[in-house]
């Protein structure tokens, strides 16, 4: 797939906050999301040389069937899927590549979660 991606392309890979923080409820889920974040951070510099951006999007809780309604706390806020889709579209225009972007609420802007040693601004 990557050899066929043209210069100017933008790739957004969906991870999760579980990919950048401990998630003791489901360690295997966390492991898979950490792998996504690592892949994006590793591919960023290489793809940048080809004019391609890649981002990991790490949202918090989203209103999907992964957590059944009867298991949800009434005090926990879930973001709407359509809001997340809008955020992903916005990432297509970000030029800083190989970064992990977090979104914890619909009311707050997304932000970069820097890797250790990342000195970019």
Name the predicted role of every residue range.
Residues 2, 40-41, 85-88:
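Short-chain dehydrogenase/reductase
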Residues 4, 21, 42-52:
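Active-site-adjacent segment of SDR/Rossmann-fold oxidoreductases
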Residues 12, 54-57, 67:
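Hydrophobic structural elements of the Rossmann-like NAD(P)H-binding subdomain
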Residues 22-26:
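Active-site "substrate specificity/gating" loop of NAD(P)-dependent dehydrogenases
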Residues 32:
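Active-site helix of classical SDR
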Residues 35-43, 47, 57:
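Hydrophobic alpha-helix immediately C-terminal to the catalytic Tyr-X-X-X-Lys motif of short-chain
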Residues 56, 64, 72-117:
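C-terminal helical subdomain
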């Amino acid at each position: 797939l990557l050899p066929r991606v043209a210069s100017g392309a933008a790739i957004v890979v969906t991870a999760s906050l579980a990919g950048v923080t401990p998630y003791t409820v489901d360690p295997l889920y966390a492991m898979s999301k950490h792998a996504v974040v690592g892949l994006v951070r590793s591919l960023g510099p290489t793809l940048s040389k080809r004019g391609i951006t890649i981002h990991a999007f790490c949202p918090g809780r989203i209103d999907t069937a992964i957590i059944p309604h009867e298991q949800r706390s009434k005090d926990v806020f879930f973001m709407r899927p359509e809001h997340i889709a809008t955020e992903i579209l916005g990432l297509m225009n970000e030029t800083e590549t190989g970064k992990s972007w977090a979104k914890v609420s619909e009311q707050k802007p997304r932000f970069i979660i820097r890797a250790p040693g990342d000195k970019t601004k």
